[in-house]
């Protein structure tokens, strides 16, 4: 009898300790944001999250408000779906939310949390951010690689020309746009072209496939990041998979560094990073350099291609908008030469189309997760230290309180309007926003403008283009875009000059 009493007492103490660890008294007394109610043991509210995270959280926000909380395993998560709350997070509380949660993916793909995207806020992150702003994404650096972008866009046009023939021909856009983005980034980074005529690299195909796998495994969708027990048993072999991906990516990146050391051309980003390594070898190790290259390839390969694919899908479903954009290009650029980057500031309607694509189909529907480094308040609610912040940009871009008819494609809504960053955030907001937004907008603008200028476009059949989205950190189309295109006279002229 006495031993049973001791056993029950022991179990009660253990359960109380676990309860206090998961749900501290100080937390329960706070004015936390609304929540879906009693969380299930161990998993919390994870059962409420569907395959498309942004849609699951949007549905919950309609019930619990634009600021609500979830208990995902043993982690408290703040979900923000309004411009006002996002602005408060990234202005008043910008430093508090400058940290990143230490998810499993960051350990392997992010070189043990040392990359600019995944590293904790601090001196190391500031060094990387400064390097990106001054050495990689400054106006001077981008202008230095202008010829690469224009050449790759021309190569895309020639590839489509060969695929379509003289009349309307069927083309699949996803792979071609991905190859363009990959080539642009790789030529800037390593001076190598991997896809296109007379170039076909199995190694690059493998690496691009690995990038796709990274985006599939990224975000806040891995249960093991929230439930330690699932990480201990390696739920669905997640950790084993990302470890294997990281090893293969690391080998590819190390080969790029090795080749640059041998060639010493001094014209690529790797060349520049290796010169920094010579002066500061203790800081710019191969691991740090590989992490920088990794971020450039991940950020530069998928997002621009996805955005152009969404934009073309929207235009094919709205041919009158496509025609209006073509008329603007012919008026501002003419019909005797290809569109150039220097033309983009004059093409306001094209810019409006891109902004509307960013709004309706953001490449990153959920911003990269943040984590609070201290207690703070958001919209009057208490947010404890260590809370994960998820900002639903997809929902903010469809907020009916700010956007008129938010589900409709209306580029005109952006005409002459200077939007606050909290209303349209395709590249994030605050000090950890994407530093490569300038490059992305140049690539997207030039590519989309050239496709409109050089081809007639039609849907395959009468049915509208399927606009369903797929899953992942970026938001791909569930069905890759296929369309009919026919070369216009301007492209015939370009082809004759090239041959």
From Swiss-Prot:
Query: So where does this one cross the membrane?
Result: 5-25
One GO cellular component term, please give it.
Answer: membrane
Name the major location: membrane
Q: Which CDD domains match?
A: CYP81
Tissue-specific expression:
Expressed in leaf epidermis and in the leaf internal phloem-associated parenchyma (IPAP) inside the mesophyll.
What superkingdom does the record give? Eukaryota
Q: Any idea where this protein resides? A: Membrane
Q: Which UniProt keywords apply?
A: Glycoprotein, Heme, Iron, Membrane, Metal-binding, Monooxygenase, Oxidoreductase, Transmembrane, Transmembrane helix
Q: What is its EC number?
A: 1.14.-.-
| Alphabetized PROSITE patterns for the sequence | CYTOCHROME_P450 (PS00086)
**Where, by residue number, does heme bind?**
434
Query: What Pfam families has UniProt attached to this entry?
Result: p450
InterPro entries from the xrefs?
Answer: Cyt_P450, Cyt_P450_CS, Cyt_P450_E_grp-I, Cyt_P450_sf, Plant_Cytochrome_P450_Monoox
Glycosylated position list? 112, 183, 266
GO molecular function, a single term:
oxidoreductase activity, acting on paired donors, with incorporation or reduction of molecular oxygen
Protein family according to the UniProt entry: Belongs to the cytochrome P450 family.
Gene3D superfamilies from the xrefs? Cytochrome P450 (1.10.630.10)
Membrane topology classification: Single-pass membrane protein
Which EC class does it fall in? oxidoreductase
Please indicate if the UniProt record lists Secreted as a keyword: no
Q: Does the keyword Transmembrane apply?
A: yes
Its recorded name reads Cytochrome P450 81Q32
Q: Where is the signal peptide?
A: none
